[in-house]
Regions:
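Structural helix-boundary/capping segments
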Residues: 67, 201-314, 330, 335, ...
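Short helix-loop capping/hinge segments that flank enzyme active sites or metal/cofactor-binding pockets
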Residues: 31, 104-125, 299-313, 363-439, ...
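Immediate post-signal peptide segment of exported/extracytoplasmic ligand-binding proteins
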Residues: 55, 89-107, 260-262, 294-308, ...
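Structural recognition of the beta-strand scaffold that forms the well-ordered cores
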Residues: 37, 54-58, 74-76, 107-110, ...
Length: 573
């Protein structure tokens, strides 16, 4: 376990040898792919034609991360063994002529709340977990290793997946500092998986993984111009993942393309009946689907798609942001029809009034975290802070300077501790059951059934919240960008301006389109999203700001990368 401070970037990329594609047996005249747009299929081709190796990829990704880390902080920590693992996988493929799985040699960046039993820390961005040792790999990490992936490192995130307090900013953590997006200066990365989305979008990794309790995969993917999938709750195991609540937590892919997300989801998912997560018992198949096989250009042919417009705000309340996103959405509806979809407009949610007035989002998280956090802590092999429960965590956080209390609040935890309900309380169980109704028959399932639909489609900003209550899958794919005359809007919640103030709406910032399907209907919504993506390729119509675009490529000769670690996290001296 790496216990030294600021361990991101292999001890901040101090004297890391970067092996470039020139070290491989490269076929002549074959151009190397750009890492900004590199796909898993490109990697498979590059490996099979000896254009480059896994070690080449890892080295280039580390160098690219070093180029943007000070400005954007998308990565908390690089796996100090990543290059060695990549070289081992290269040897297996090239010398032993064997592969471990479909992602053999492909680098993957994990959000820093996903447990790994290696030299990486798993901290949810907090020093409260720094140096802790998990009992074993999370099921997701173990699945990825079995598929042959290289765990490249840990991505920045909103501390505790933004379950700490209202006066905080998306993407900030004590360990990682402030993650920022790359499409506008001081861009809000959204959260809580902002680091994963920024890293995927800039080509700092082949693939990235986030977690989603209330939109934390979908929202960052939406605002950073990438693809995100919030899987059905239970399709991906939460074993050895720092929790908020098992009722809503999900672990999902964040990638540059739909097909890459499909590859990643197949590798991550399951198994059915994982002993570390009983929600996996609900998986309706014994073999995880090959989701990439559903990525066909004609995937919308005959699809029955509905638009539940009553989830939108009343037109009189539209903001400039609403207008641009809904206008862009309306503009692509003829395209969906031309691709063969049968689009039913105004396929509205049947009990939208109940959803709007009766949802108890915070109660589920208040009680869930108070219960599930101690369970996570109890399984650690080493717990250097001695924190056992939420009361301990609150007291520790309020006294450790790097956690920036009281500038950054802890009121979520205070409210949770003040609530006398437990996960066995009838009032809590009733609230969870009602939330499940509000996310299913009152909204998503109700509309699917009433109109005989395969899926729903919405601008991403309006798509995810009902789904989290009942565990429905959502995929987001780029739809557009705010135009050049857009008024800049800053995040705000009445808190300290030193904490708030990131730009959430601004010229050039992306926004997405979401498909929502029935429980465990990932295959169909992946199929629909892929067909839309291939017909539009909107991700490449606007690029991040040039100053935030890494320049290192596979062909870039870099002998060594020297990177000075800034003391920007407020560590005690």
């Amino acid at each position: 376990m790496a216990l030294h401070a600021l361990t991101f970037l292999t001890t901040c990329i101090t004297a890391v040898t970067v092996v470039t594609a020139s070290s491989s047996t490269q076929l002549p005249f074959k151009p190397l792919p750009d890492l900004f747009s590199l796909t898993v299929d490109d990697i498979i081709t590059g490996f099979s034609t000896n254009q480059f190796t896994s070690a080449d990829l890892v080295s280039a990704y580390i160098a690219r991360t070093a180029e943007v880390q000070l400005a954007l902080r998308p990565v908390i920590e690089i796996n100090p063994d990543a290059l060695l693992i990549a070289q081992t996988l290269d040897n297996e493929r090239l010398i032993q002529n064997r592969t471990r799985g479909p992602l053999h040699g492909v680098p993957v960046l994990l959000k820093d709340n996903i447990g790994t039993a290696d030299q990486l820390n798993t901290t949810a961005g907090s020093y409260a977990l720094y140096g802790s040792i998990v009992p074993h790999d999370s099921t997701v990490a173990a699945n990825l290793r079995a598929a042959g992936a290289v765990i490249l490192g840990k991505a920045g995130l909103s501390e505790w997946a933004f379950w700490r307090g209202t006066n905080n900013s998306n993407g900030w953590s004590a360990r990682g500092g402030q993650v920022k997006g790359a499409y506008y200066d001081n861009q809000d990365p959204s959260g809580s998986s902002g680091g994963s989305a920024v890293a995927a979008g800039l080509g700092l990794t082949a693939l990235a993984v986030g977690t989603d309790t209330g939109g934390s995969v979908i929202d960052p993917a939406n605002i950073n111009g990438v693809v995100g999938i919030r899987p059905s709750t239970g399709l991906t195991s939460r074993a050895v993942v720092v929790p908020i609540t098992v009722v809503q937590d999900s672990v999902g892919p964040i990638t540059r393309t739909v097909k890459d997300a499909a590859y990643l989801l197949s590798a991550m998912a399951g198994p059915k009946g994982d002993p570390g997560d009983n929600y996996t018992n609900a998986i309706p198949f014994t073999t995880i689907p090959n989701y990439a096989s559903y990525c066909i250009p004609s995937g919308l042919q005959g699809a029955k798609i509905g638009i539940p417009r009553n989830i939108f705000p009343a037109p009189v309340n539209y903001t400039e942001s609403d207008i641009q996103q809904i206008d862009a959405f309306n503009a692509i509806l003829p395209l969906l029809a031309s691709l063969g979809a049968n689009v039913t407009d105004n396929a509205d949610y049947p009990d939208i009034d109940a959803y709007n007035t009766e949802a108890q989002f915070t109660l589920a998280l208040d009680i869930g975290f108070k219960h599930d956090f101690p369970a996570y802590m109890s399984q650690l092999k080493f717990n250097p802070t001695g924190i056992e429960d939420l009361a301990d965590l609150l007291n520790w956080t309020q006294t450790f300077r790097a956690e920036q209390y009281p500038l950054r609040s802890t009121d979520f935890w205070e409210n949770s501790l003040a609530c006398n309900l437990t996960t066995d309380s009838p009032d809590y169980l009733a609230a969870i059951a009602h939330n499940a109704y509000l996310g299913s028959n009152a909204t998503i399932q109700g509309a699917l059934d009433a109109y005989g639909l395969d899926a729903l489609v919405l601008p991403t900003a309006y798509s995810v919240r009902p789904a989290v209550f009942a565990g429905y899958p959502v995929i987001t794919v780029p739809l557009g960008y705010f135009n050049a005359t857009t008024t800049v809007v800053q995040a705000g919640g009445g808190g300290d301006p030193a904490v708030w103030g990131l730009n959430t709406v601004a010229p050039g910032i992306p926004f997405g389109l979401s498909f929502i399907g029935p429980r465990f209907g990932e295959a169909q919504i992946i199929q629909f999203a892929y067909a839309f993506e291939q017909a539009t390729m909107i991700r490449y119509q606007n690029l991040p700001l040039a100053k935030y675009m890494p320049v290192t490529q596979l062909h870039t000769p870099v002998a060594q990368a020297e990177f000075e670690c800034p003391d920007a996290l407020g560590l005690p001296k």
